[in-house]
């Protein structure tokens, strides 16, 4: 897909990553049709002058209608936790199947699909199992597909960063799982958006799966230290919580709380996290992602405001 007049269907356009992807595609002169759930149709994208298609990836008919007249699709929809009818199976598997079917029906050949770093590594969680099923659906689609597996994505609008900022800003020590040696490889949301925009036009990436992470590999302890230093201008103390105790607490909270601080699956994913080799993506897309701390410093004011600090 190289025509400047091409229209791109973007699912998840109102989300954290979607907001940046849509802005990047429009900056590069591409027309965007945003698939937006009816309860979000009056937020953000409409004010930006986007073409809105109301629908839900779980509803095949609405996705099929949204895909008509498009030449490419970027599928970004995903959830980290299940809520009611928004289950991993419904959103990741059924939703991706509906997007693939809609692309086929509408003659959309190019599909760039967002998965997650850790998919395909055998981590036994509902999140990763369904991400892997979604990847299989894309690979078997017959389309010109590219799969992108980002690590933790950071930016001032992201719920993860907002919650982490609030955590380090609380009074008292920052709690760690064990010694806090779990690994993060944060990648900036604007670099992820740039990568998606390049992938749409770079057909050499078709049929490939790319792990995408930032250049810095941080322990959870060092991640918190960086947040405190940049956002608060000071160091924080830590409280190491034994992993078995965290595991037991997560299990109990999952059974008694509607929105627990951490779920057993999330804890398993954190414990199983491993860094990725960033070289294949850097070679394919022609750039290195930005380092974490200077980028965080550049948007620190926005993040403080978003977190209410």
Model-found features: residue ranges?
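Conserved beta-loop-beta element that borders a ligand/cofactor-binding pocket
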Residues: 115, 135-157
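Short alpha-helix in the Rossmann-fold core of NAD(P)-dependent oxidoreductases
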Residues: 89-93, 112, 131
């Amino acid at each position: 897909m190289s025509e400047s007049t091409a229209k791109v269907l973007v699912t998840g356009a109102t989300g954290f990553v979607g907001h940046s992807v849509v802005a990047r595609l429009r900056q590069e002169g591409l027309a965007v049709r945003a698939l937006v759930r009816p309860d979000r149709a009056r937020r953000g994208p409409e004010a930006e002058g986007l073409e809105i298609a109301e629908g839900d990836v779980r509803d095949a008919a609405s996705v099929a209608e949204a895909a008509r007249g498009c030449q490419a699709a970027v599928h970004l929809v995903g959830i980290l936790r299940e809520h009611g009818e928004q289950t991993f199976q419904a959103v990741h598997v059924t939703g991706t199947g509906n997007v693939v079917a809609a692309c086929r029906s509408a003659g959309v050949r190019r599909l760039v699909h967002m998965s997650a770093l850790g998919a395909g590594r055998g981590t036994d969680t509902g999140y990763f199992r369904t991400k892997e099923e979604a990847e299989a659906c894309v690979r078997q689609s017959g389309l010109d597909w590219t799969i992108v597996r980002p690590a933790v994505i950071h930016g001032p609008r992201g719920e993860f960063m907002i919650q982490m900022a609030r955590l380090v800003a609380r009074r008292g020590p920052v709690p760690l799982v064990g010694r806090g040696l779990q690994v993060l490889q944060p990648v900036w949301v604007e670099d992820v958006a740039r990568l998606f925009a390049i992938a749409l036009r770079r057909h050499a990436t078709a049929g490939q799966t790319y792990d995408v992470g930032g250049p810095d590999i941080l322990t959870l302890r060092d991640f918190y230290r960086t947040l405190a230093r940049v956002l608060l201008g000071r160091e924080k103390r830590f409280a190491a919580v034994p992993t078995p105790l965290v595991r037991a607490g997560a299990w109990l909270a999952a059974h008694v709380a509607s929105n627990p601080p951490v779920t057993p699956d999330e804890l398993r994913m954190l414990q199983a996290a491993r860094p990725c080799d960033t070289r294949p993506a850097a070679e394919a897309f022609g750039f290195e992602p930005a380092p974490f701390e200077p980028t965080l410093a550049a948007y620190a004011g926005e993040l403080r405001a978003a977190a209410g600090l």
